[in-house]
Amino acid sequence: MIQRQSHSTIYVIDQDEALKFYRDILGFEVKTDMTMEVSGFRWLTLSPKGQPDLEVILAQVSSSPMFDADMVEEMKALVSRGAFGIGVFETDDIHGDYGRLSKQGVEFVSPPQEQFYGTEAVVKDNSGNWFSLTQPKR
């Protein structure tokens, strides 16, 4: 029986730039950063500080053995245009995080807005992926 989700993948244009965003700006912690000898594939995972049992894989589109050259170009175009929503990151201070991240140059698709489930802002990472930054109603 399935017990839990342990990993989730975010496709990125440049792993080094994505690492700076998720680690240095969002505060995620690096769990694994290694290059596989045979394939040259870089396995880069991070976790939100409050959730070390979930690892986010930052997978560079061009380095994935799953994509042929045409697919790589298609995926890069889709990622950079924001075609993928990558999920929800929870916060306990949406307005404070919005101010802090805005000052650091993070692009917001929408500012914090009240929703039935809490207060949500929509953020873009430096590859073009968007995610919801949400402070749930308690």
Model-derived regions, located:
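N-terminal beta-strand motif that seeds the catalytic metal site of vicinal oxygen chelate
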Residues: 1-19, 31, 37, 84-87, ...
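Short, basic, helix/turn surface patches
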Residues: 56-64, 135-138
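Active-site beta-strand termini and strand-to-loop segments that position acidic
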Residues: 47-51, 123-126, 136
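Conserved positions at the start
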Residues: 5, 41-43, 118
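Core segments of cupin and vicinal oxygen chelate
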Residues: 11-61
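Conserved beta-strand segments that form the floor/walls of ligand-binding pockets within enzyme
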Residues: 7, 11, 45, 57, ...
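Vicinal oxygen chelate
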Residues: 15-16, 64-130
